[in-house]
Amino acid sequence: MASDFLPVHRALLSVSDKTGLVELARVLLAYNIELLSTGGTATIIREAGLPVQDVADLTGFPEMMDGRVKTLHPVVHGGLLGRAGIDDAVMAKHGIAPIDLLILNLYPFEQITAKKDCTLADAVDTIDIGGPAMLRSAAKNFARVAVATSPDQYPDLLAELQEHHGQLSAEKRFALAVAAFNHVAQYDAAISNYLSSVSDMHTTLPLRHEFPAQLNNTFVKMTELRYGENPHQTGAFYRDVHPQPGTLATFQQLQGKRLSYNNLVDADAAWECVRQFEAPACVIVKHANPCGVAVGMACSDAYEAAYATDPTSAFGGIIAFNRTLDAVTMKSILDRQFVEVFIAPYYDADALAYAAKKANVRVLRIPSSAAMKATNQYDFKRIGSGLLVQSADTMHIHSDVLRTVTTLAPTDKQRRDLMFAWRVVKYVKSNAIVYAKDNRTIGIGAGQMSRVYSARIAGIKAADAHLAVTGSVMASDAFFPFRDGIDAAAATGIKAVIQPGGSMRDNEVIAAADEHGIAMLFTGIRHFRH
């Protein structure tokens, strides 16, 4: 099969995305490939002074119904589906000539339906019929026909044509066929998701339910993983077809061993947390929980403070920065501790050179900027034979909407620390407690079945790290059901608390804070994380 190259004599071009169209047509013509085309695609090729035959002239049947019917014809599909050496006589009898290459991309259904003013009629008019049919015909017959669905594929396609003097290999045809079927599947899934979400078709703008009756999601494999959650499990990482800029799925691995399942779970937690901060920040994560978070004047300051929170847990952790990682900080980290993964938007050349001395350390770059703050719109979690779907927890609060519920109000400095702690606690597994002071974590209590134990653990962590809790603040991801959590915090020296509120015993909790001289803010927002 490796030597199965076939020449391209005729190509049919019909594209909604005209990017690179004229350049592509010129190269095809240079190899004496006859061009067929439709509608606007043919017009652009012709206006460039290049010869092209309209499909309507080929079929003898005009485009009709405002372009809804133009390629649904045996001459077109027979030209794509005809098998060399099997269907030759039938094709000759009916005057059907082979089509060896199909260049086609579909009507932009997802882009049109994403517009706020898209009506149901607009959506229906954007459903491509002839395009998917041609893609399926060409892809099914990959033994003879090649098909490209995106301008991104043109360079490789043309490179092979040029290298092999107008011929394409079986491997290339098969790979393009797989991509075409994937493209059609994604397209049909988008249509299904949209129509399944329409709850009232009679309004000017169709009312749509947030969760469609049938959910069809498409993901693309980025890489196979070293192993799954445990070494006896296999794993792979798939990304959205259109990943949000600045999210983990856009990473580039600059060095290091193959990533594992746990590496990526932890990396996502670290990256999403560090992206919340405007000033230089460092987040160290272990087992999907932050074990140290800090903001500083530079990466080095932020790392030193984050590491000091829990040096024991930081060993073998994932470390994320929201600024360019410099060589001095990289050297300081690697000379001090074992690191599984580094994440940063950029790295100094000297920092990468030093990291290269530790060849197994994984170094990920995620291009990011202030404009790249998008996150997942929905979260998914597999359960037995099912899938839980929820809107992502993207709720942010501003300090001016916080409600002081105690006699004592927090100072301006305490409010800044409370806002810092509140940003961090969102990324800690429930029940979650964060002690913080001076824009750094002092102690973190994560994943306990009772909130009071998380508070106690945060205090224990601070004591183990020889960090003074006195004067610190505390954040809780959910309300305190009893006063015991406040009592435990007061015993360690906490002076201000931020929590959602909403407990049946809020009055008891507030009274406890007043007894201990603690200022308390209610956010009205819970941040459970499981």
From Swiss-Prot:
Pathway(s) this gene product operates in, as recorded in its UniProt entry: Purine metabolism; IMP biosynthesis via de novo pathway; 5-formamido-1-(5-phospho-D-ribosyl)imidazole-4-carboxamide from 5-amino-1-(5-phospho-D-ribosyl)imidazole-4-carboxamide (10-formyl THF route): step 1/1; Purine metabolism; IMP biosynthesis via de novo pathway; IMP from 5-formamido-1-(5-phospho-D-ribosyl)imidazole-4-carboxamide: step 1/1
E.C. number(s) listed in UniProt: 2.1.2.3, 3.5.4.10
Record bears the keyword Oxidoreductase: no
GO cellular component, one term: cytosol
Keywords attached to this entry: Hydrolase, Multifunctional enzyme, Purine biosynthesis, Transferase
One GO process term, biological-process aspect: 'de novo' IMP biosynthetic process
GO molecular function terms attached to this record: IMP cyclohydrolase activity; phosphoribosylaminoimidazolecarboxamide formyltransferase activity
Pfam families in UniProt: AICARFT_IMPCHas (PF01808), MGS (PF02142)
InterPro entries given in the database record: AICAR_Tfase_dup_dom_sf, Cytidine_deaminase-like, MGS-like_dom, MGS-like_dom_sf, PurH-like
All copies of domain MGS-like, residue ranges: 1-149
Catalyzed reactions: (6R)-10-formyltetrahydrofolate + 5-amino-1-(5-phospho-beta-D-ribosyl)imidazole-4-carboxamide = 5-formamido-1-(5-phospho-D-ribosyl)imidazole-4-carboxamide + (6S)-5,6,7,8-tetrahydrofolate; IMP + H2O = 5-formamido-1-(5-phospho-D-ribosyl)imidazole-4-carboxamide
PANTHER family noted in UniProt: BIFUNCTIONAL PURINE BIOSYNTHESIS PROTEIN ATIC, BIFUNCTIONAL PURINE BIOSYNTHESIS PROTEIN PURH
Domain remark from Swiss-Prot or TrEMBL: The IMP cyclohydrolase activity resides in the N-terminal region.
Family: Belongs to the PurH family.
Protein's recorded name: Bifunctional purine biosynthesis protein PurH
Phylogenetic placement of the source organism: Bacteria, Pseudomonadati, Pseudomonadota, Gammaproteobacteria, Lysobacterales
